[in-house]
């Protein structure tokens, strides 16, 4: 078990490790993935752990509707890098904890940092509703955002604002902010 998982072993969320087996489980169960990346010295990681991840309502939602993965960025800098890039490209800033919602295939559809308990429940509930109602729409949107990011990275474009504008339109669709 990774250090990060040991640190969170007593909270009620059934955290899994980052592995092919876990990703395959998400695909087989057709469940969205909650990916939470942090590190031991991260103040806001500890705050979110205490205020959000120990809440029974949060745990019930995450355990029943999502595959939840906890990653220590110091043990998996490669994973952190991929999803931090997504956060930076879509929001313009980053930080930890890095919390992402992924499609069952691991493609990111949302990323943020610290969330209060009520914000987290609202966000997860909204994504679960959208995925149940029209999973293909979420897949199409995720693919569009990823293609824009890849295109911009390939051409070294400075047009990050275009991705951010598209992301803001996507967030409006979610009615989260």
Regions found by a protein language model. Give the residues of each.
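Replace the tail clause
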Residues: 3-177
